């Protein structure tokens, strides 16, 4: 009759394998959380792959929208995140594309922005800075593509490894993008469309 005290080399090997697998699972879970593998962004104003909300449309150049920056919520950023940045880029605009928004120096404690955070002053209260977009205005400039084919707008939230980037309010969005790229731990994206 076997007892719990009987020695079975095969049993020991199996126990070791199970222990190793359990430890590997824990390490993998911790590493995923550390790297922000499940980092996501969403908006109450639209869904990924859908059309951008009517309140986000630009108010000039033939477009007649309220030009309000979208509400955004992000989750599961890398554990070592020290600040966040956000960009909105039209990848279908001619030549090099079109920057609609770039924001940096959002504190790591912030996990969402309300709608119209750009114009309302909410970002300034957080200590964040905004770039000059390709409409040549500081802050958010909504979609307003030429009539014809809809354009795709990529909204990206970046987790950064620095508290602040060496940038000033009103610098070009492309410069923001370059500085953001050099300090990124992870990013989350959604893409929306708009046409007229």
PLM ranges: what are they?
Residues 16-18, 155:
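Solvent-exposed aromatic/hydrophobic patches embedded in short alpha-helical segments
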Residues 33-196:
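N-terminus-centered regions that define maturation/targeting leaders and the start
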Residues 19-29:
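Bacterial N-terminal signal peptides
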Residues 5-7, 18, 34:
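Aromatic (phenylalanine/tyrosine) cluster motif
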Residues 11-12, 31-33:
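N-terminal twin-arginine translocation
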Residues 1-13:
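N-terminal secretory signal peptides that target proteins for export/translocation
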């Amino acid at each position: 009759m076997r007892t719990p005290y009987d020695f079975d080399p095969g049993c020991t090997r199996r126990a070791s394998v199970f222990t190793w697998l359990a430890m590997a699972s824990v390490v993998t879970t911790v590493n995923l959380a550390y790297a922000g593998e499940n980092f996501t962004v969403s908006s109450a104003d639209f869904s990924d792959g859908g059309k951008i909300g009517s309140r986000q449309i630009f108010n000039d150049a033939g477009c007649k929208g309220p030009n309000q920056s979208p509400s955004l919520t992000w989750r599961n950023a890398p554990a070592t995140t020290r600040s966040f940045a956000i960009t909105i880029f039209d990848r279908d605009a001619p030549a090099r594309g079109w920057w609609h928004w770039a924001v940096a120096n959002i504190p790591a404690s912030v996990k969402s922005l309300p709608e119209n955070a750009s114009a309302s002053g909410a970002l300034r209260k957080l200590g964040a800075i905004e770039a000059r977009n390709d409409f040549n205005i500081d802050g958010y400039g909504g979609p307003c593509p030429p009539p014809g084919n809809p354009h795709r707008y990529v909204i990206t939230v970046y987790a950064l490894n620095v508290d602040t980037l060496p940038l000033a309010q009103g610098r070009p969005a492309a410069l923001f993008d370059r500085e953001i790229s050099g300090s990124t731990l992870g990013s989350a994206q959604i893409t929306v469309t708009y046409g007229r």
